[in-house]
Amino acid sequence: KGKPVAFASRSSTSGYLIPTWDMMKKGLIGSQKSLTDFFSLTLYGTGYVSAVEKVLSGEVEAAAVSDYVFKGNNQYLDDAQKAQLRIVQEQGPVPAHTLCARSTLSQSDRKILQDALLSMNQGNPELRDRIFNGELIVVDQDKHLEVTREALAFQKKLKP
């Protein structure tokens, strides 16, 4: 409260939507209290790394980003940068990237596309990880997106 923060971007699920939804559920922001009423400054990056860079530069005190930027061996942050940071809160699970197909695509073509993408799990995991940041799985779309839809509904009530 009262400190400057950065969000990954306004279009990020894990770097904006879910953290603000969590704040709304806790009553910290809402229809009468905006992000700028709670934080002294609210900045938006162009992605996870740019938000973390704002913390590393001292421009903000905290950033909302996906954990894959911070955890494990990755190309996003080096060990020296990670040593300057700490995780203060984790949320989730957060629905990951969703692949969509146009509604006029035939069922057989959808199956071909799905099988081709899923084959990357064993056939080319390095490419899969560079594109999707992890294993591809088939999920129930309504259940998978339930949290996102609820968070989006709350966003409409958030004071600008």
Segments from the language model and where they lie:
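Bilobed "Venus flytrap"/periplasmic-binding protein-like clamshell domains
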Residues: K1-E53
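Sec/Tat-exported extracytoplasmic proteins
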Residues: F7-S9, G27, E59, N74-L77, ...
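Solvent-exposed coil/turn segments that connect beta secondary-structure elements
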Residues: R10, Y68-V69, T104
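Alpha-helix N-cap/helix-start motif
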Residues: G15-Y16, A63, R110
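Extracytoplasmic/secreted envelope proteins and their assembly/folding machinery
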Residues: T20, V49-V52, D67, R110, ...
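A ligand-binding cleft/hinge motif common to bilobed small-molecule-binding domains
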Residues: T20-K25, K54-K82
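Short beta-strand->loop
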Residues: S40-L41, N74-P93
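An extracytoplasmic/periplasmic, membrane-proximal ligand-sensing/linker region
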Residues: V94, C100-A101, L105-P160
